[in-house]
Amino acid sequence: MIHRRELLKSAALLAAGRAFGAGADQLHFGCQTNAWPIAARDFATVLAVIRKIKDYGYDGFETGFANVEGQFEHAAEARRQIDGIGARFFGVHIFLLQYDAETHVAPAALYERVAAGGALLGAEHLILSGTPPADDAGRKRKAEALNRAGAYAGQAGLRLAYHNHGPEVEHNGTEIEFLLRETDPSKVWFLLDAGHAFHAGADVPAFVRRHHTRLAGMHLRDYKNGEQVPLGMGDFPLRAVADAIRQTGWHGWVLNEEERLTSKPGDSAVKPARDALFRAFGKGV
């Protein structure tokens, strides 16, 4: 078994030569793997989805930590296989059904292990989701926890990105604005789930204009009559968001996320979503 200190040291050494500014003067297009069924214990199924994402013309991918944590003990071979596909590993995402009761994000022991292991696999971001605290005291603890997680991720050679769901942007964005104020911009970035934000009533183009300097990436998803549909088939203001991105000169990652609560639509959702995304940004399909 690899000890955590050894894992972190190895990850930091491997990541030291990786520049986050590589290609920083252009947008990057990615896709979350969660649109497809994956057998987390069978890494071949993960690689097959990454290869499919690359074949669709995306620059890179994001995936849940459960899909890759089994590779941490023999990361060199897994990294070789990922690199062989030619897709960048935008980020490894920790989504849980239950979070730390005090911090409202993943426990430190988990995110430290995932940050170190993810870095060995070539991940560029550690992505954390969380639950909404009930008051400012809880939000303060959450912000402090994100700062600590961001510092640790930085030691491993990754950037930390906090991913929102709907509650963070409800009530005029009370929580997300608090986290933006109280987290250290040198340690904490945000992965704006623009679809969740839109569904919760946020003015997404305006948010992008205000906070683009804190954004590592955006998840784009669409809704029609309260149900998620492939991007471009609902009411999400895709063109307006693309215009806001152009106007700000932001150069991060825009990612299709076509997960569903009760199914894995795969190609039937990703292909039209990819086409809509690429058209909106003038990228050939």
Q: How would you describe each model-predicted region?
A:
Residues L47-G64, L121-G122:
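Catalytic domains of carbohydrate-active enzymes, especially glycoside hydrolases
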Residues P37-F43, G64-A75, L97-P107, P132-K140, ...:
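Acidic-and-aromatic substrate-binding clefts and catalytic sites of carbohydrate-active enzymes
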Residues A12, A16-G17, G84-R88, L97-F190, ...:
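Active-site acidic/histidine proton-transfer and metal-coordination neighborhood
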Residues I2-G30, I38-A39, F43-K54, G173-L192, ...:
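Histidine-acidic metal/acid-base catalytic patches
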Residues F29-T33, F61-T63, F89-I94, L126-L128, ...:
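Hydrophobic faces of well-ordered beta-strands that scaffold small-molecule active sites
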Residues N67-E69, R80, S186-F190:
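Histidine- and aromatic-rich ligand-binding microenvironments
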Residues H74-I85:
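Aromatic-lined substrate-binding rim segments of carbohydrate-active enzymes
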Residues K52-D55, Q81, G117-L120, R148, ...:
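Alpha-helical scaffold elements within enzyme catalytic domains, especially in hydrolases
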